Amino acid sequence: MLYKRSSQLFLEAEKVIPGGVNSPVRAFKSVGGTPIFAKSAKGAYVYDEDGNRFVDYINSWGPMILGHAYEPVVTAVIEKAKSGTSFGMPTELETEIAKLAVSMVSNIDKIRFVNSGTEACMSAIRLARGFTKRDKIIKFAGCYHGHSDSFLIQAGSGAITFGSPNSPGVTSGTAKDTLLASYNDIQNVKNLFDANKNEIAAVIIEPVAGNMGCIPPQKGFLEALQQLCHENNALLIFDEVMTGFRLAKGGAQELFNVQADIVCFGKVIGGGLPVGAFAARNEIMNYLAPLGPVYQAGTLSGNPLAMAAGLAMLKALNENQEVFARLEEKTAYLAKGIADVLTSNNVVHTINRVGSMVSVHFDANPVFDFETAKNGDNDTFKKFFHGLLAEGVYIAPSAYETWFISDALTYEDLDFTIRAVDKVSKNL
């Protein structure tokens, strides 16, 4: 494939945008080459500025669960834009989507909308600290909760891709209140609680980690974490920015039957527009201003276009819940097909999957935390990435990102992808 127009656009972008991109992973720095500039997308496919078509497994990093330019979402946004794009006032639409979201997730009473997953997680931490009157939090190495200072401590895909697990600009004072645990290691978490008695406000975790590849929680881990938080009067925060409304109607909480105290949402809940949210029971949410002392605000929070897109998306998922079973079947089919051809071509690999999230690791050993995720062969991944790109398959340009499957993908698309993996893996 030729990428002449993308190359020209990247050179122009570099003159006025740091690194030529507005989110670092898009720059292809870890895989080399020139980033592909998108021109349009529809269904399972994205089209670049050179006219190339790709089967898309990024899906805007997760939101496009029903495919690109999903008609009910597009129609809702167009119609809403005709009556105004932003008001800075409450609207009926905000209440409508809030009611629907609360009805879909069994353990939340109220929800506050923000503009991104980063804002959602940042606000959830502030709320937890205010509610518990404690300062420290526990996060897990390799889990990414946005680019807020508190979270940029071994933050997974973005940080490790660029070799800077702790970002300059994060103060030592902020860092000392962020305690780091190993994913899937409950004893490690117990030790942190024991060493910081009555100081820990919350534990925040991706119930399925998605920023060191796709890492499932081991059996009993989330339940033990829930119990440990309860015993220590700390809040459990699930960052469901990736998993919310994707793994099930009620997200990872429903899938694993474990309930958190605060839940963060993003991606799917916005239907492709900038939306984040955090939610909890009344007792906790009533601590937020204007009801309570914990301040949180946003000029564009509850933006009518974003709310229209999110409402259309959630309605589609709520009214067609068989989509989750279809996604499970499609992703299982894809994962097995990829595993079979990699094995037949003698390529060392491990594939992790939960629902419609999957990752390919070029390592023979199980991948269950940040340290094991880093053992993969990055040189092999680079060849794999560029080989698939040349075949018309677009996966994330980082070995530490998850593939997101959309319902727009047909079995013909999946077979096309498996054949591409077969062809590429013969030369790895």
Swiss-Prot record:
Compartments where found: Cytoplasm
Keyword line: Cytoplasm, Isomerase, Porphyrin biosynthesis, Pyridoxal phosphate
Cofactor(s) of this protein: pyridoxal 5'-phosphate
Annotated GO biological process: protoporphyrinogen IX biosynthetic process
Cellular component, GO, one term: cytoplasm
PTM annotation (N6-(pyridoxal phosphate)lysine): residues: K267
Catalytic activity, as annotated: (S)-4-amino-5-oxopentanoate = 5-aminolevulinate
InterPro entries associated with the record: 4pyrrol_synth_GluAld_NH2Trfase, Aminotrans_3, Aminotrans_3_PPA_site, PyrdxlP-dep_Trfase, PyrdxlP-dep_Trfase_major, PyrdxlP-dep_Trfase_small
Pathway in which this enzyme or protein is active: Porphyrin-containing compound metabolism; protoporphyrin-IX biosynthesis; 5-aminolevulinate from L-glutamyl-tRNA(Glu): step 2/2
Coiled coil: none
Catalytic class of the enzyme: isomerase
GO molecular-function term, one example from the UniProt record: transaminase activity
Superkingdom of the organism of origin: Bacteria
Alphabetical list of CDD domains matching this protein: OAT_like
EC number annotated for this UniProt entry: 5.4.3.8
Family to which this protein belongs: Belongs to the class-III pyridoxal-phosphate-dependent aminotransferase family. HemL subfamily.
Record text on subunit structure and interactions: Homodimer.
Official protein name in the record: Glutamate-1-semialdehyde 2,1-aminomutase
Organism: Flavobacterium psychrophilum (strain ATCC 49511 / DSM 21280 / CIP 103535 / JIP02/86)
